[in-house]
Amino acid sequence: TSGETLNTSQWTVIPALTKSIVIDRAQNDLLLNINGMYQANNGAANNTGGITSTIGFFVNDQLIDVKPLYLDFQSSCSYRQFMIYGIAKNLSPGTHTVKFAIRNISAPNISGLTVTYGGPNSSCSSLSGFESAMSSTITINQPYSF
């Protein structure tokens, strides 16, 4: 729910993408982008169902936007690329901390199932670290008043 406080028992923060930003003007727009891949170690016999998760965009540990993700198990070591945007408007002037976090919602009951975000799953060989890395972009628009 928008406005909820970051609860690290429910959300996994991606530390490498945490950034401090400075807002100078009361009128502003913030565009957040995160992209990368995630991969499960499902086997060929588990090609039904998938994993439902969400990406949360947090400013000062308050949820400002959330977007769903779904990884469909269509083949062994299923993976999916994603590019997701979040927005915020009119943050107060000052320094703010932006965090991106992942929350797993549901997954099939498969013994030993693991999901890796931003890297290849250690049980799979179909992705490289380079192609599965996560990155983020933070764009701040602060129009001048003349």
Predicted regions and their residues:
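Extracellular jelly-roll beta-sandwich "head" domains, especially the C-terminal globular C1q domain
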Residues: T1-F146
